[in-house]
Amino acid sequence: ALPYSKNIASPKAASEMVKLAMDHFAGIDIVINCAAILRDGLVFKGSPEDWDAVVKNNLSSAYYLTNAATPVMRDQFKETRGDGNNYTWGRIINIGSTAGLYGNFGQANYGSAKAGLFGLTRITAMEMVRSQVTANYVAPFAHSRVTDMIEPANQEQAQYKDRAMRVSPHHVANLVTYLCSDQANDVTGQVFGVRGREVFIFSQPRPVATVASIDANWTPEKLGEAVNVTLRSHFTDLATDLEAFNTDPIV
């Protein structure tokens, strides 16, 4: 293992990290994007500076490293690096958050960055599939330096932090190790969650109901009526991730 102590929230640092790996290991097999910071603040109170810092560290850093590493991984596939057979082994794991999938009070910047990371994961999976490099998103629930940063503003947040502090991150490592193994050769573009000894797969945004009209003069009023009759029952509620996962994890 080689340490790299610079902040990778810059294209230059990401490129330097890739070069360091290439100089010492002559290749890149796995990229795990897990850089994260918190600067919580309500959308009407948060500062633009905090927004920029959180998005840069949680989302842009992942793009910079992926952007720097994927050309190497594509070339490795073309050159059949390894045992001389077709090179079929490349992994990208993006460590996300349920805050980016559900949302959470005071985390407009963090949730937006982690939601963006979901989009980056999907598109990376699509664009790298021909090079047989997989990309997956993992939303962890565990004790980490990020959970240490949480300053609970209410009892619900205090309970969430208390639960997280009791969950070992090795459960997250188990899932990531599986995704980097030969067993997961065809697993890509997926959103996983891991909460102690519980692992789950998330659904992804797809149409669940539709309304249409053969009337060329479809008015907003008629559309509203159709929405109320057909679509309203499919609306998604505003439950936060804290509310969705408010029970004790299996540890």
Protein language model annotation of sequence segments:
Residues 26, 102, 115-118, 123-134, ...:
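Active-site-adjacent segment of SDR/Rossmann-fold oxidoreductases
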Residues 42-43, 47-55, 89:
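Substrate-binding pocket helix/loop in short-chain dehydrogenase/reductase
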Residues 66-67, 122:
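A short, exposed helix-loop element centered on a Lys and neighboring polar residues
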Residues 158-251:
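C-terminal helical subdomain
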Residues 97:
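Residue(s) in the substrate-gating loop at a strand-loop-helix junction
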Residues 5-16, 48:
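The beta1-alpha1 cofactor-binding region of Rossmann-like NAD(H)/NADP(H)-dependent oxidoreductases
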Residues 20-33, 39, 134:
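A glycine-rich helix->loop->beta "capping" turn
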